[in-house]
Amino acid sequence: MITKLIPKKVFFTSGAGTHPEKLESFEAALRDACIEKFNLVTVSSILPPRCEIVTKEEGLKELSPGEIVFCVMSRISSNDPGKTLTSSVGCALPVDISKHGYISEYHAYEESAQDAGAHAVKLAESMYSTWTKEEPLKTFSIPRSSTVKDSGDWMTVISAAVFVI
């Protein structure tokens, strides 16, 4: 029997990590965001109809280590000392909960978390509005920013919308 994989819940998280190895800086960012125990599969930008937004703590309780978990993720890495890295996901909630909303991902160098968050919201809002011809019910973002240390170690910054099926 084939079942549809339509998420019922979503939570938002972010993290930053540093390490001499790029891959391990990504792992450290996942740990900081509390999503390192899952096999993450990135998906595009649709917030399913009737998808409930829950806290990170509530969402994590419903997931198991090793589980394949779908997410919308913004990710940026660098080992350039002093460079600021910023990631954000933005969300546009539908006016009618029987319709879908949008989640955007955005990342940039040398941009504040506030500016990246505003840009992610603008993207999600634009995708929603061009489809519905109306403003979303609500918008928000989960931005994260960090600066590469002088050691030249790799820094990775992530923001994610994590789905619970």
From Swiss-Prot:
Residues with the Pyruvic acid (Ser) modification: 45
Gene3D superfamilies: 3.30.60.30, Pyruvoyl-Dependent Histidine Decarboxylase, subunit B
Cofactor note: Binds 1 pyruvoyl group covalently per subunit.
Keywords in alphabetical order: Decarboxylase, Lyase, Pyruvate
Site (Cleavage (non-hydrolytic)): 44-45
Reactions the enzyme catalyzes: L-arginine + H(+) = agmatine + CO2
Entry's Gene Ontology BP terms: arginine catabolic process
Cofactor: pyruvate
Enzyme Commission number(s) of this protein: 4.1.1.19
InterPro entries in alphabetical order: Pyr-dep_his/arg-deCO2ase, Pyr-dep_his/arg-deCO2ase_sand, Pyruvoyl-dep_arg_deCO2ase
Molecular functions per Gene Ontology: arginine decarboxylase activity
Pfam families tied to this protein: PvlArgDC
Keyword Transmembrane helix in annotation: no
Enzyme class per UniProt: lyase
NCBIfam families referenced in this protein's UniProt entry, alphabetically: PRK12398.1, pyruvoyl-dependent arginine decarboxylase
HAMAP family assigned to the protein according to its UniProt record, in alphabetical order: PvlArgDC
Family of this protein: Belongs to the PdaD family.
Protein name listed in UniProt: Pyruvoyl-dependent arginine decarboxylase 1
